[in-house]
Amino acid sequence: MSAVSQAGERFFATAPRGLEALLAAELGALGAKDAAIVPGGVAFGGDWRACYAANLWSRLASRVLWRVAEFGYAGDEDLYEAARGVDWPRYFDVGRTLRVNVSATKSPLKSLDFATLRVKDAVCDRFRDATGRRPDVDRRRPDIRVHVFLEAARGALYLDTSGEPLFKRGWRSGAGEAPLRENLAAGLVMLSEWKFDEPLLDPMCGAGTILVEAAAMARGRAPGMKRSFGFEKLKAFDSPAWEKMKRESRNPSPPRALRLFGSDR
């Protein structure tokens, strides 16, 4: 059985605050199951097709994370043991570069930097025990991102299926000063309840991000079509299924006359 056909995975899609309800509806339309809204994102279940579709089609998500473990903890060593207990070589090759990110709410840990170091050590130690090698760390452009979310006494470990944040659509060649992120721009368009046959004016358009996102929505263009994703570097990656999904997404709606206007003066 291919990895993509197995159901029952758990994911978490992060998003700008205020867009969680819209994101839950969007993910549901893309095949997500049991969506649960929390501040800053949406937890959901599904198979790998749902994960691929969320990365390819979500206009609102910032990242789609795959949950690989949950645990209780009281200190740094509990965190190390929880991360060491995950069979990381099952998920990615030792030759992949690695980055660990830790975020926390009401955590008793004194230093998140030290917690990050301990999780990194745990992942590398697990690989050393299994393969005799340790993955290299790359903080700028890693192949694999491990995310750790900590609450007061519980935590979860995730693998990032997105790679670069999803608001990086792949079309922007440069960024002006304080650019509006694409997923936030898409959320503003959705919240406006703009209809495609109506004019849309952005009187402070800057780089035109709101108008570009509006045009992409009207055309039915997949926002992730021109970029790569973190899941392509995981062992669970099903290339034929992914290529099929991309082929099926390359048929946007026929061109329509849009009235989009932008000004920055």
Predicted features along the sequence, with ranges:
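Generic beta-structure capping elements
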Residues: 47, 103, 151, 158-164
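Short glycine/proline-rich turn/loop motifs
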Residues: 103-105, 167-169, 252-253
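SAM-dependent Rossmann-like transferase core, predominantly class I methyltransferases
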Residues: 157-191
